Amino acid sequence: MRMDDQRESDNLEDRRGDGGGGGGLRLGGGRMGLGTIAIALVASYFLGINPLTVINMLSGGGMPAMEQSAPAPHPVPANDPMAHFVSKVLASTEDTWREIFRANGKQYEDPKLVLFSGATPTACGTGQTAMGPFYCPGDHKVYIDLAFYQELKTRFHAPGEFAEAYVIAHEVGHHVQNLLGIADKVHQAQQRAGKVEANALSVRMELQADCLAGVWGK
Protein backbone atom coordinates (compact mmCIF):
# COMPACT_ATOMS: atom_id res chain seq x y z
CA MET A 1 0.00 0.00 0.00
CA ARG A 2 1.12 3.55 -0.69
CA MET A 3 1.39 6.08 2.12
CA ASP A 4 3.57 8.64 0.32
CA ASP A 5 1.00 11.45 0.42
CA GLN A 6 -0.49 10.57 3.81
CA ARG A 7 0.12 13.01 6.66
CA GLU A 8 1.76 11.78 9.87
CA SER A 9 -0.10 11.63 13.17
CA ASP A 10 0.57 13.96 16.08
CA ASN A 11 -0.35 11.12 18.46
CA LEU A 12 2.83 9.05 18.29
CA GLU A 13 4.93 8.47 21.41
CA ASP A 14 8.42 7.09 20.93
CA ARG A 15 9.69 5.46 24.13
CA ARG A 16 12.26 3.21 22.51
CA GLY A 17 15.53 3.01 24.33
CA ASP A 18 13.98 4.12 27.62
CA GLY A 19 13.97 0.69 29.27
CA GLY A 20 10.75 -0.16 31.06
CA GLY A 21 9.12 -2.30 33.70
CA GLY A 22 9.44 -6.04 34.08
CA GLY A 23 7.45 -9.09 34.94
CA GLY A 24 5.06 -9.44 32.04
CA LEU A 25 1.93 -7.74 30.89
CA ARG A 26 -0.59 -7.61 33.71
CA LEU A 27 -4.19 -7.30 32.62
CA GLY A 28 -7.24 -8.20 34.60
CA GLY A 29 -5.09 -9.08 37.61
CA GLY A 30 -3.03 -11.79 35.90
CA ARG A 31 0.22 -12.19 33.97
CA MET A 32 0.86 -14.11 30.79
CA GLY A 33 4.10 -15.75 29.84
CA LEU A 34 5.46 -17.42 26.75
CA GLY A 35 3.92 -20.75 27.78
CA THR A 36 0.47 -19.20 27.64
CA ILE A 37 1.21 -17.80 24.21
CA ALA A 38 2.36 -21.21 23.00
CA ILE A 39 -0.90 -22.76 24.20
CA ALA A 40 -2.79 -19.99 22.45
CA LEU A 41 -1.02 -20.75 19.18
CA VAL A 42 -1.84 -24.44 19.46
CA ALA A 43 -5.46 -23.63 20.26
CA SER A 44 -5.63 -21.30 17.28
CA TYR A 45 -4.53 -24.14 15.00
CA PHE A 46 -7.35 -26.44 16.11
CA LEU A 47 -9.99 -23.70 16.32
CA GLY A 48 -9.09 -22.20 12.96
CA ILE A 49 -8.54 -18.73 14.44
CA ASN A 50 -5.72 -16.43 13.39
CA PRO A 51 -2.90 -16.78 15.99
CA LEU A 52 -2.69 -12.99 16.20
CA THR A 53 -6.36 -12.92 17.15
CA VAL A 54 -5.82 -15.39 19.98
CA ILE A 55 -2.78 -13.52 21.30
CA ASN A 56 -4.65 -10.23 21.20
CA MET A 57 -7.60 -11.88 22.91
CA LEU A 58 -5.39 -13.02 25.76
CA SER A 59 -3.74 -9.63 26.08
CA GLY A 60 -7.05 -7.78 26.34
CA GLY A 61 -9.99 -7.55 28.71
CA GLY A 62 -10.26 -7.19 32.42
CA MET A 63 -10.04 -4.06 34.50
CA PRO A 64 -6.99 -1.86 33.94
CA ALA A 65 -4.32 -1.87 36.60
CA MET A 66 -3.00 1.26 38.26
CA GLU A 67 -1.06 3.34 35.76
CA GLN A 68 2.69 3.34 36.12
CA SER A 69 4.83 6.39 35.37
CA ALA A 70 5.88 6.41 31.73
CA PRO A 71 9.14 7.80 30.36
CA ALA A 72 8.93 11.04 28.40
CA PRO A 73 8.56 10.42 24.66
CA HIS A 74 11.18 11.76 22.27
CA PRO A 75 11.03 12.72 18.57
CA VAL A 76 11.03 9.97 15.97
CA PRO A 77 14.37 9.92 14.12
CA ALA A 78 14.19 11.16 10.54
CA ASN A 79 15.98 8.03 9.30
CA ASP A 80 13.42 5.61 10.77
CA PRO A 81 11.08 4.72 7.88
CA MET A 82 9.06 2.12 9.81
CA ALA A 83 8.24 4.57 12.60
CA HIS A 84 7.14 7.16 10.06
CA PHE A 85 5.10 4.50 8.27
CA VAL A 86 3.11 3.54 11.37
CA SER A 87 2.61 7.24 12.13
CA LYS A 88 1.02 7.62 8.71
CA VAL A 89 -1.11 4.52 9.27
CA LEU A 90 -2.33 5.95 12.57
CA ALA A 91 -3.16 9.24 10.85
CA SER A 92 -5.11 7.32 8.22
CA THR A 93 -7.19 5.59 10.91
CA GLU A 94 -7.79 8.98 12.55
CA ASP A 95 -9.13 10.39 9.28
CA THR A 96 -11.39 7.36 8.78
CA TRP A 97 -12.90 7.26 12.26
CA ARG A 98 -13.23 11.02 12.66
CA GLU A 99 -15.38 11.08 9.53
CA ILE A 100 -17.49 8.09 10.58
CA PHE A 101 -18.07 9.42 14.09
CA ARG A 102 -18.89 12.90 12.73
CA ALA A 103 -21.42 11.43 10.31
CA ASN A 104 -23.15 9.81 13.30
CA GLY A 105 -23.18 12.92 15.47
CA LYS A 106 -20.27 11.84 17.66
CA GLN A 107 -16.75 13.11 18.23
CA TYR A 108 -13.87 10.70 17.81
CA GLU A 109 -11.15 10.72 20.45
CA ASP A 110 -7.80 9.89 18.86
CA PRO A 111 -5.77 7.15 20.55
CA LYS A 112 -2.04 7.44 21.12
CA LEU A 113 0.37 4.99 19.49
CA VAL A 114 3.35 4.14 21.69
CA LEU A 115 6.55 2.71 20.21
CA PHE A 116 8.61 0.82 22.77
CA SER A 117 11.35 -1.76 22.94
CA GLY A 118 11.51 -4.57 25.47
CA ALA A 119 9.04 -3.34 28.06
CA THR A 120 7.14 -0.21 28.98
CA PRO A 121 4.71 0.89 31.72
CA THR A 122 1.04 1.23 30.78
CA ALA A 123 -2.23 1.85 32.58
CA CYS A 124 -2.83 -1.89 32.19
CA GLY A 125 0.45 -2.98 33.79
CA THR A 126 3.83 -3.59 32.21
CA GLY A 127 3.70 -4.19 28.47
CA GLN A 128 6.34 -6.47 26.98
CA THR A 129 7.52 -7.22 23.47
CA ALA A 130 6.62 -10.91 23.86
CA MET A 131 2.94 -10.05 24.04
CA GLY A 132 2.80 -8.47 20.61
CA PRO A 133 0.85 -5.27 19.84
CA PHE A 134 -1.99 -4.44 22.21
CA TYR A 135 -4.49 -1.75 23.19
CA CYS A 136 -4.84 -0.56 26.76
CA PRO A 137 -8.32 0.85 27.50
CA GLY A 138 -7.04 2.44 30.71
CA ASP A 139 -4.97 5.04 28.88
CA HIS A 140 -6.46 4.85 25.36
CA LYS A 141 -3.11 3.89 23.87
CA VAL A 142 -1.95 1.30 21.35
CA TYR A 143 1.46 -0.23 22.13
CA ILE A 144 3.83 -1.86 19.67
CA ASP A 145 7.45 -2.92 19.51
CA LEU A 146 8.31 -2.55 15.83
CA ALA A 147 10.40 -5.72 16.08
CA PHE A 148 7.02 -7.49 15.93
CA TYR A 149 6.88 -6.83 12.21
CA GLN A 150 9.85 -9.11 11.62
CA GLU A 151 7.99 -11.83 13.53
CA LEU A 152 4.92 -11.08 11.44
CA LYS A 153 6.92 -11.92 8.32
CA THR A 154 8.89 -14.92 9.53
CA ARG A 155 6.61 -16.59 12.08
CA PHE A 156 3.14 -15.71 10.83
CA HIS A 157 4.07 -15.53 7.13
CA ALA A 158 2.27 -12.21 6.66
CA PRO A 159 4.71 -9.87 4.90
CA GLY A 160 3.88 -6.57 3.26
CA GLU A 161 2.85 -3.07 4.22
CA PHE A 162 -0.87 -3.82 4.30
CA ALA A 163 -0.37 -6.57 6.89
CA GLU A 164 1.79 -4.19 8.92
CA ALA A 165 -0.82 -1.45 8.71
CA TYR A 166 -3.66 -3.87 9.51
CA VAL A 167 -2.05 -4.66 12.87
CA ILE A 168 -2.37 -0.99 13.85
CA ALA A 169 -5.90 -0.74 12.45
CA HIS A 170 -6.95 -3.82 14.45
CA GLU A 171 -5.76 -2.31 17.73
CA VAL A 172 -7.46 0.97 16.84
CA GLY A 173 -10.57 -1.15 16.36
CA HIS A 174 -10.35 -2.04 20.05
CA HIS A 175 -10.17 1.68 20.79
CA VAL A 176 -13.37 2.21 18.83
CA GLN A 177 -15.01 -0.59 20.83
CA ASN A 178 -13.92 1.18 23.99
CA LEU A 179 -15.26 4.57 22.89
CA LEU A 180 -18.63 3.09 21.91
CA GLY A 181 -19.02 1.24 25.21
CA ILE A 182 -18.90 -2.17 23.55
CA ALA A 183 -15.86 -3.28 25.53
CA ASP A 184 -17.51 -2.43 28.86
CA LYS A 185 -20.67 -4.31 27.97
CA VAL A 186 -18.69 -7.37 26.92
CA HIS A 187 -16.60 -7.32 30.09
CA GLN A 188 -19.76 -7.09 32.19
CA ALA A 189 -21.23 -10.05 30.31
CA GLN A 190 -18.00 -12.00 30.84
CA GLN A 191 -18.22 -11.47 34.59
CA ARG A 192 -21.65 -13.11 34.60
CA ALA A 193 -20.69 -15.90 32.20
CA GLY A 194 -18.85 -19.17 32.61
CA LYS A 195 -15.31 -19.65 31.36
CA VAL A 196 -16.24 -21.09 27.97
CA GLU A 197 -18.78 -18.37 27.23
CA ALA A 198 -16.42 -15.66 28.48
CA ASN A 199 -13.69 -16.88 26.14
CA ALA A 200 -16.17 -16.99 23.27
CA LEU A 201 -17.06 -13.36 23.95
CA SER A 202 -13.36 -12.46 23.83
CA VAL A 203 -13.03 -14.13 20.45
CA ARG A 204 -16.04 -12.18 19.20
CA MET A 205 -14.43 -8.96 20.40
CA GLU A 206 -11.32 -9.79 18.40
CA LEU A 207 -13.33 -10.66 15.31
CA GLN A 208 -15.24 -7.40 15.60
CA ALA A 209 -11.94 -5.50 15.90
CA ASP A 210 -10.89 -7.25 12.69
CA CYS A 211 -14.14 -6.07 11.10
CA LEU A 212 -13.51 -2.50 12.26
CA ALA A 213 -10.02 -2.70 10.80
CA GLY A 214 -11.68 -3.74 7.56
CA VAL A 215 -13.81 -0.58 7.65
CA TRP A 216 -10.55 1.38 7.61
CA GLY A 217 -8.99 -0.84 4.96
CA LYS A 218 -11.73 -0.87 2.35
Predicted regions and their residues:
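A Zn2+-metalloprotease active-site environment signal
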Residues: Q6-G21, G29, T36-K218
